[in-house]
């Protein structure tokens, strides 16, 4: 864990500026990992997840009117933050917990979603590979179902077909 901060005041403390740089590495955090159906439950709790977090924060404040009956202070804040999943337990590279996907090397607040290309209007539109129609969890698609992109081309829609579309936490705020 590291933080470096500089603070300065100018013009008899009428303007105050502060900048902070930080870097943090959390080790052995708990997360859920999927287990086989034979276990009788969906997930187990495991330690060993590592996350890095780094960023910058800038604060500026000014006393526009200080020694008058009317006081006027102005403040400004801006920040940048980036987090990254460094490691998952049991040397896994990806895990899915409910509808949330965690992938090593990506941000923990990433949105991984299926790409929708429309709706099948009839059964003949559903792609067929080796005599089997495209499916999700073994259930074949039919007319009226959404058209999801089969990213990995294995004729099954699963967690490997989710694509990164954005993040829940904006990198810049202010």
Regions inferred by a protein language model and the residue ranges of each:
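Outer/extracellular conduits and scaffolds centered on Gram-negative outer-membrane beta-barrels
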Residues: 1-174
């Amino acid at each position: 864990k590291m933080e470096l901060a500089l603070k300065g005041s100018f013009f008899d403390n009428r303007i105050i500026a502060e900048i902070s740089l930080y870097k943090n590495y959390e080790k052995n955090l708990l997360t859920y990992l999927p287990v086989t159906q034979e276990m009788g439950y969906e997930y187990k709790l495991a330690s060993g997840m590592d996350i890095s977090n780094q960023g910058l924060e800038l604060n500026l404040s000014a006393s526009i009117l200080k020694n008058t009956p009317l006081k006027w202070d102005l403040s400004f804040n801006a920040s940048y933050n980036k987090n990254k999943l460094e490691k998952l337990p049991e040397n896994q590279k990806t895990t899915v917990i409910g509808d949330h996907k965690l992938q090593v090397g990506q941000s923990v607040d990433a949105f991984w979603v299926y790409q929708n290309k429309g709706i099948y209007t009839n059964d003949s539109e559903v792609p067929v590979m080796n005599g089997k129609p495209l499916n999700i969890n073994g259930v074949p698609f039919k007319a009226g179902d959404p058209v999801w992109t089969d990213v990995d081309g294995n004729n099954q829609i699963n967690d490997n077909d989710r694509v990164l579309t954005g993040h829940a936490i904006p990198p810049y705020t202010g």
